[in-house]
Amino acid sequence: MSRAESSWERLVNAALRRDRTGGVAGGNQSSIVGYVPSSLSNNRDIDAILRAADEIQDEDPNIARILCEHGYSLAQNLDPNSEGRGVLQFKTGLMSVIKQKLAKREVGTIDRSQDILRLQEFYRLYREKNNVDTLKEEEKQLRESGAFTDELERKTVKRKRVFATLKVLGSVLEQLAKEIPEELKHVIDSDAAMSEDTIAYNIIPLDAPVTTNATTTFPEVQAAVAALKYFPGLPKLPPDFPIPATRTADMLDFLHYIFGFQKDSVSNQREHIVLLLANEQSRLNIPEETEPKLDDAAVRKVFLKSLENYIKWCDYLCIQPAWSNLEAINGDKKLLFLSLYFLIWGEAANIRFLPECLCYIFHHMVREMDEILRQQVARPAESCMPVDSRGSDDGVSFLDHVIAPLYGVVSAEAFNNDNGRAPHSAWRNYDDFNEYFWSLHSFELGWPWRTSSSFFQKPIPRKKLKTGRAKHRGKTSFVEHRTFLHLYHSFHRLWIFLAMMFQALAIIAFNKDDLTSRKTLLQILSLGPTFVVMKFSESVLEVIMMYGAYSTTRRLAVSRIFLRFIWFGLASVFISFLYVKSLKAPNSDSPIVQLYLIVIAIYGGVQFFFSILMRIPTCHNIANKCDRWPVIRFFKWMRQERHYVGRGMYERTSDFIKYLLFWLVVLSAKFSFAYFLQIKPLVGPTRMIVKQNNIPYSWHDFVSRKNYNALTVASLWAPVVAIYLLDIHIFYTIFSAFLGFLLGARDRLGEIRSLEAIHKLFEEFPGAFMRALHVPLTNRTSDTSHQTVDKKNKVDAAHFAPFWNQIIKSLREEDYITDFEMELLLMPKNSGRLELVQWPLFLLSSKILLAKEIAAESNSQEEILERIERDDYMKYAVEEVYHTLKLVLTETLEAEGRLWVERIYEDIQTSLKERNIHHDFQLNKLSLVITRVTALLGILKENETPEHAKGAIKALQDLYDVMRLDILTFNMRGHYETWNLLTQAWNEGRLFTKLKWPKDPELKALVKRLYSLFTIKDSAAHVPRNLEARRRLQFFTNSLFMDVPPPKSVRKMLSFSVFTPYYSEVVLYSMAELTKRNEDGISILFYLQKIYPDEWKNFLARIGRDENALEGDLDNERDILELRFWASYRGQTLARTVRGMMYYRKALMLQSYLERKAGNDATDAEGFELSPEARAQADLKFTYVVTCQIYGRQKEDQKPEAVDIALLMQRNEALRIAYIDVVDSPKEGKSHTEYYSKLVKADISGKDKEIYSIKLPGDPKLGEGKPENQNHAIVFTRGNAIQTIDMNQDNYFEEALKMRNLLEEFDRDHGIRPPTILGVREHVFTGSVSSLASFMSNQETSFVTLGQRVLAKPLKIRMHYGHPDVFDRVFHITRGGISKASRVINISEDIFAGFNTTLRQGNVTHHEYIQVGKGRDVGLNQIALFEGKVAGGNGEQVLSRDVYRLGQLLDFFRMMSFFFTTVGFYLCTMLTVLTVYIFLYGRAYLALSGVGATIRERAILLDDTALSAALNAQFLFQIGVFTAVPMVLGFILEQGFLQAIVSFITMQFQLCTVFFTFSLGTRTHYFGRTILHGGARYQATGRGFVVKHIKFSENYRLYSRSHFVKAMEVILLLVVYLAYGNDEAGAVSYILLTVSSWFLAVSWLFAPYLFNPAGFEWQKVVEDFKEWTNWLFYRGGIGVKGAESWEAWWEEELSHIRTLSGRIMETILSLRFFIFQYGIVYKLKLQGSDTSFAVYGWSWVAFAMIIVLFKVFTFSQKISVNFQLLLRFIQGLSLLMALAGIIVAVVLTPLSVTDIFACVLAFIPTGWGILSIACAWKPVLKRMGMWKSIRSLARLYDALMGMLIFLPVALCSWFPFVSTFQTRMMFNQAFSRGLEISLILAGDNPNSGL
């Protein structure tokens, strides 16, 4: 054996050992081969053969060897040269296994005929050993018996495994043997027929009907299957067309044949259509015929829903649909069309993002099919003519001929986007291709495709073009140019409105004393020119923005753009001309003034008329009726482009009035604030400044002096104008928060917010549950009589109990409660003989003992009853004990004993009735009775033994003695002593000697419950103690009282899928990951044990370990696996998500199981998970698909993620995994890559079993990864709805019970249109980890609850935000899917689903009676990356056509709602920061120009009201107060007022204002940079547990350009203002005006270190400094990353500046840094009063000298290696000369020391400005050879900035209390729960097991 083979064999053996030892933990991988390479996987026999070999290798290694050899020969035949990826390794490994088996075999040559005989003999032996003939019959008998036990499950698994092995053995025999004995051949065929259910299927076994799957027995499924069968009108299929023997041909087989669809795609869509039809039928009625038939109504509804978009498309293009008359089409034809559409959609791959393209394809294929339908025999369609005329099983004719040409051009364009770096205008995205089909021009493409059309023209790759500009076909109808002008282009109505209102308010403010004069009237009339000029600006932008799309855009659309341009151009010129002439007119009666008024009136009237006609909902019908008039149609077309999307986006009148009133209130507040506090106070100062003609300027002024001091006025008004633009968002936030609070209160949110409330209201829960979550019952009456109410309460409790108990059990399984707490919380079945309701023990515990004390202390019966009835649960406890004890005793005792008990109870009843209880019984001795009864019950609850029987008799006799001697009074005692029968039995010793031991389960449960009631002494007021368990129970019980749609039965509910995209995140923590320590000595497991100590103890108890056990004590595989799951369920892992989502299936099984049972049995949930009918019903209604994009590659690379995913499939039988399989196979001597979309499930051997494999036209990832991942797998989803779930989300069993209620919202009235997206509330479960996590959690919670509540209603503008919303699945899959995928522009892919829905006349709602868990980022760096990603995504949204169309086509008030809750929020955030800059640069101008001092001297600005108002508004926005307002109101609503105040104050102590200010900078930087330069990309933020210390250099790299540089600029401005613009009397004024700016700067500089764990520990700080200096001075190079070298990082930071426009913008923005030098040099004492420009010129000479000195001292050591001494001499001499020059200047000239510092202050920003401009023009500087000098300068600046930040951190680290405070501040929540964060951070791990 060669060395390579030997090494490979060792690797294989190691892998085999790992697989065997990790069997439980990692899934049952085959021990012969773990993975068959994808290039061989198309032959599925290999995998099956190797599995069979694995199965039998222990029984007969020789047979296993034969199978392995056959598998090897198949692999060799498929790929003889081993060219496929992984094939060589696979074959080598398999050969080594074969050689091992041969080595163990007896010596001799291999006789193939002998092997065949052995194989035949083994087949017979294997059948006999496993009792094959009786195996299936035994399972059938077990199943029919209804005994759903583990035995049944075991039998089923065994049968499947045996028959799967037999099938492989028979198949191999048939392939190896030339002849097989006839008898054996018959047996093999018979066994193969019995192995039918080993054939892979998804939900319904349509191609292989099986007896073990109950879905096929449902009448609605049978009806749906029957409806698809071949009908008489269909041409006959060729006789050789393969149809499975287990079913007859259907219409999908017909379509498969004529169009060449793929076999698996047809099978997939067959099941899809069957389920759609069956579920629709079940909602109408259940067919009861012998041969069930579908109702026409069900077919019609599915047909219209699925083809609604196609019908609208035909209507839009004014073409006849594929049918002439819809009503004339019969059901069979509708199903044929429906099947064709879904087959097209199912195989369309990336073309699914082009819904109207699919309409085009469907339109032509239907017409082509109609031609074929006229024939007798089916023939392949010309457009999809397969190579094999019979229609191959795996034919891909449709894929090759229809989809591939489209995919080819789409992929070519996508490749040309240069991985997202190319401008959007340079390539066609998905929307461009789709919108081509919005015009009749698309029909020029013909059918079959005319591939010579320019539409199919592929661009020349950019890399092959020297200029870098690719020739390409133009964009379609919209071009995403990268510019801020899109904000005006899309929302021009808002900006026009704000500008005109500002102008009007200013005119009123300046003329407030003379509002009725002609002058004022003419000024107000200036609004006319303002309007038309701004409209003209918008039309100019339309012309500019369409550049790049003119050649391909419809001529009509282009004509409209230029008509509008001409119209508004002429209107603006004409109206402006008239206005100017009116100003010169002598009086108001002048003809020109009158003409102007008439023109304005007409123009305004027409504008107003069409606004009403097209924007007001009630006028839409009128507008549509007016379309027959050409003039009206023309004006409507001119005013609003008629796109396919965006039509009819109006709401009903009542909804319109609601959001209109909301915005009127907001706008009234906003403009009142603007007028009284912003504009009006500036009127006087403005007039005075304008009048000042002799203001001395201290510098050389160019602009302001001779122009009414224009720049001074601008510096005064600029911050006010900035705040004017953004404060509307402030008022929106405040009013929406209060409205959301009121709406939440109306919806009854937060009514149950404590355990006390649960206790108090528990008796109302059963009734509320029956009303809200249970289907109506016939035996539940509405009669209100006392007896009927009691009966109804009993029925309600009985039906509520199984659901409540399952909730409690799930809490225990999740380790949130202890076993004892579970016992207290569980509710009795309430279905027994007791007529009263039995409540859970946690309500009744200790109540009996308290009642005993009350009875002993009270003096009368009335007092006893009055005191007991004060507490309802005490009353219930007493009643239950009283009646239950009687039942137990009478059932246990016989003869005289039973008579005695009955007599006692009769006497008690008589005494109570006569109110003589105190006279007849000595209640002060009740404790004696309770003691004896408790002793008796303690014995009876055990199993019967002779000793227990004696003990019970003794206890009864003691009880008898106590009753006779102690309890009964003298009078009552006499009655019993004279009772001869009893006395005789007692005297003879017969009394109580015969006992009937309680063996009945119900009676035994009563005994145990009674015992608990007597023995539990502690109050259960704090049960459960776990905060998460409390929260969940509180929310669930609260939701029972909310407005929930009444549910339908599971059978009639809407079906749905859950869909989770996954890439490579953590699936399940391994033990290595859990126990690995970080640099602080902390492991994940140790962290979790400290964070969740109670849950850790509960876990140990659940697996049967002592609570002090260490993880090292868990030595068996089962416990280790449970530990891995326990830890994973507390992280943000796929395992947690899968567990949560599979609760849907569990809930549906429970609901279905109980609904199917009748009478009292309907309350017994025992065995519901084993019921085949319940499982089948749940599978029909629920599907869970996780789309693991690279699962195939992970399997191939044997990644642990693949093993863990397989394990999840084993544990969750309904879980389906979809993935993209990349198959590298040789073709014509070259490696050819093919892509398949595959769906797998777990099989009986624990491996994944392929269900469907659908070939794709190419690599599916053409755009953004996540939506492409979703798109390829969406074909495997099922149902009417689909819930999008991220892999960091969770779900809860109690919430899953409400899913069918939520789905009923689709049929509820939510406006003029039915809902298409149902919004779902989220709970952020990571909020308790740290203060940062709580900030994010609270911020997120306020948005997903209060914020979205208002957006949905009344604003009617809620979108989809990537949260767990439920989509109308059919609506969305026929309209482009649940997300958009174009590269970069759709980086925030989820929100575009909401945009698309709204544009396509959908409706998005929000519902808060159900919630889903969600994890959030918990570290500052994670949060910053996440917020940067979202801000960048919003920057891209600004450029998108969706935002443009929504901004243009929504009515004005919905448009404002849309703007301020999407991109407007980020614009206002950016304006908040810009306001600081505007204010400070304005103050710097006043200070440096000298104007500020003059103004102060002349007391012009005595009133700072406007500026103060502006700065206060900015500061409040800055520190997050308007994030906090919704948060606080949400707290008040759901936690109560006091707790809300405590939470808010706590947040302030935790420095939440610093965090929100810091976040402001993050959003501003990424939003602005994305619009300017692009560069938005998906950020993998990481979802781990963050308690580790972040290094200084890492923080510096992340925040240097986004925060630190900007903070330094703010500080420079503040210092300049302090130095030159402030006098001694103005100190208070300076502080008041600049406090927000100082706070912002300090927050931006030091927040990363304040929120850095151990950020102020001295040792860490020292290590950080060393690491930072190493990074700073380490030179970069090829392959060096930014984390390793400053140079590499610096180059990365400049990579986003790529375009000429970007370089110009950066240059313009950088010019601001030169203001410092220009202003400061004129303030130097050296220049005196000279204000000539020469002073500024000499300052540049000085700066040049400094640069020369810098170059001298940074001269390259490599270059100077030969003249080091000379260089040192020159450097020393230069330094001495510089110092001497400064000293001489200070001594001999007016230059002062302060002037030197002033020069430093001036030159630092100048240097940075030069550096910024140089970076923008990097290619030019490189060609000039100056780049190294620039890099040296940049390093110096970063070094200085780093030191300025580092010094305060180091200083604080000297004081230990700072570190203590920081730890307390960061982890306060953890401390409040008794956590040991200080121990965690110190790394003092006491756990020896780690």
From Swiss-Prot:
Q: What class of enzyme is it?
A: transferase
Enzyme Commission number: 2.4.1.34
Q: What happens when the gene is disrupted?
A: Plants develop deformed or collapsed and inviable pollen grains.
UniProt keyword Hydrolase present: no
This protein's UniProt keywords: Cell membrane, Cell shape, Cell wall biogenesis/degradation, Glycosyltransferase, Membrane, Transferase, Transmembrane, Transmembrane helix
User: Which stretches are Cytoplasmic in the membrane topology?
Assistant: 1-489, 545-560, 613-658, 744-1457, 1534-1539, 1725-1732, 1790-1795, 1860-1890
Membrane topology listed for this record: Multi-pass membrane protein
Q: Which reaction does it catalyse?
A: [(1->3)-beta-D-glucosyl](n) + UDP-alpha-D-glucose = [(1->3)-beta-D-glucosyl](n+1) + UDP + H(+)
Indicate whether Cell membrane appears among the record's keywords: yes
GO biological process annotation, one example? (1->3)-beta-D-glucan biosynthetic process
Q: Which family does it belong to?
A: Belongs to the glycosyltransferase 48 family.
The record's function comment reads: Involved in sporophytic and gametophytic development. Required for normal plant development. During pollen formation, required for the entry of microspores into mitosis and microspore symmetric division. May be required for correct temporal and spatial control of callose deposition during pollen mitosis. During plant growth and development, callose is found as a transitory component of the cell plate in dividing cells, is a major component of pollen mother cell walls and pollen tubes, and is found as a structural component of plasmodesmatal canals.
Under which name does UniProt file this protein? Callose synthase 9
Which organism is the protein's source? Answer: Arabidopsis thaliana
Chain's gene name = CALS9
